[in-house]
From Swiss-Prot:
Known partners and oligomeric status: Part of the 30S ribosomal subunit.
Compartment list: Plastid, Chloroplast
Family indicated by similarity: Belongs to the universal ribosomal protein uS15 family.
NCBIfam families, sorted: S15_bact (TIGR00952)
Organism name: Amborella trichopoda
PANTHER family, sorted: RIBOSOMAL PROTEIN S15, BACTERIAL AND ORGANELLAR (PTHR23321), SMALL RIBOSOMAL SUBUNIT PROTEIN US15M (PTHR23321:SF26)
One MF term in the entry's GO annotations: structural constituent of ribosome
Entry-linked SUPFAM superfamilies: S15/NS1 RNA-binding domain
GO annotation terms (biological process): translation
Keywords attached to this entry: Chloroplast, Plastid, Ribonucleoprotein, Ribosomal protein
Record-level GO cellular component terms: chloroplast; ribonucleoprotein complex; ribosome
CDD domains registered for this protein in UniProt: Ribosomal_S15p_S13e
Protein's name according to its UniProt entry: Small ribosomal subunit protein uS15c
């Protein structure tokens, strides 16, 4: 799986406080919650938690895109997530 190789490479190179590692952890949580919510459609507390995590990930990605576009594009490609819509 691509994600397992990604986490092994990021844990060796980067520290757990780095933006990339935090975005990876948020993405992992979002994927787990998405599969949970497919089974439990009326679990509103999990929906709220997922919206909070999505907001945190969006803010982290916005920070990274402002600081370093190359690292941002690389991370988006590795995690297979879409770029957020711009206003």
């Amino acid at each position: 799986m691509v994600i397992n190789s990604f986490i092994s490479s990021i844990s060796k190179e980067e520290k757990k406080g780095s933006v990339e590692f935090q975005v990876f952890c948020f993405t992992d949580k979002i994927r787990k919650l998405t599969s949970h919510l497919e089974l439990h459609k009326k679990d509103f507390l999990s929906q709220r938690g997922m919206r909070k995590i999505l907001g945190k990930r969006q803010r982290m990605l916005a920070y990274l895109s402002n600081k370093n576009k190359v690292r941002y594009k690389k991370l988006i490609g590795q995690l297979n997530i879409r770029e957020p819509k711009t206003r």
